[in-house]
Amino acid sequence: MARIAGVDLPKNKRLDIALTYIYGVGRTTALKILDTVGIDWTLKTDDLSGEQVNTIRKELEDNYKVEGDLRRDQIADIKRLMDIGCYRGLRHRRGLPVRGQSSKTNARTRKGPRRSVMSRKKK
């Protein structure tokens, strides 16, 4: 089992699919990495030699932000938006949709479960 960027890649998958288990690497990036390194993307993870694993690992470390570094940068970017007080930062702070979606009736994923409003009884 190959371990790259702190992630155990699945044994019986094609290499381009296995690399997508790393946070920050999708299909396009995986194919680009394999093309740069010169490894066939149809290879299974089991068939990789130690040298090939090391070349993929080196390519990822040198040219891509993945896993912890990427997560840390994304959190820092959101924190910066909230600190400068821009509109997007306010939406993040309030837990509302950030990209202009309507929030009058929908947006339940972002807002969470409905909070019921208690009606006042008439005397």
From Swiss-Prot:
PROSITE patterns found in the cross-reference section: RIBOSOMAL_S13_1, RIBOSOMAL_S13_2
Query: Keywords for this entry?
Result: Ribonucleoprotein, Ribosomal protein, RNA-binding, rRNA-binding, tRNA-binding
User: Which superkingdom heads the taxonomic lineage of this protein's source?
Assistant: Bacteria
GO terms for biological process? Answer: translation
For this protein, the record's Gene3D superfamilies field holds: 1.10.8.50, 30s ribosomal protein s13, domain 2
* A Gene Ontology molecular function term of the record: structural constituent of ribosome
Give GO cellular component annotations, separated by semicolons: cytosol; small ribosomal subunit
Q: Which SUPFAM superfamilies does the record cross-reference, listed alphabetically?
A: S13-like H2TH domain (SSF46946)
Pfam families annotated for this entry?
Ribosomal_S13
Where is the stretch described as Disordered?
A: 95-123
Q: Where is the composition biased (Basic residues)?
A: 107-123
Q: Which family does it belong to?
A: Belongs to the universal ribosomal protein uS13 family.
What is this protein for, i.e. what is its function? Answer: Located at the top of the head of the 30S subunit, it contacts several helices of the 16S rRNA. In the 70S ribosome it contacts the 23S rRNA (bridge B1a) and protein L5 of the 50S subunit (bridge B1b), connecting the 2 subunits; these bridges are implicated in subunit movement. Contacts the tRNAs in the A and P-sites.
Subunit-level organization: Part of the 30S ribosomal subunit. Forms a loose heterodimer with protein S19. Forms two bridges to the 50S subunit in the 70S ribosome.
The name this protein goes by in its record: Small ribosomal subunit protein uS13
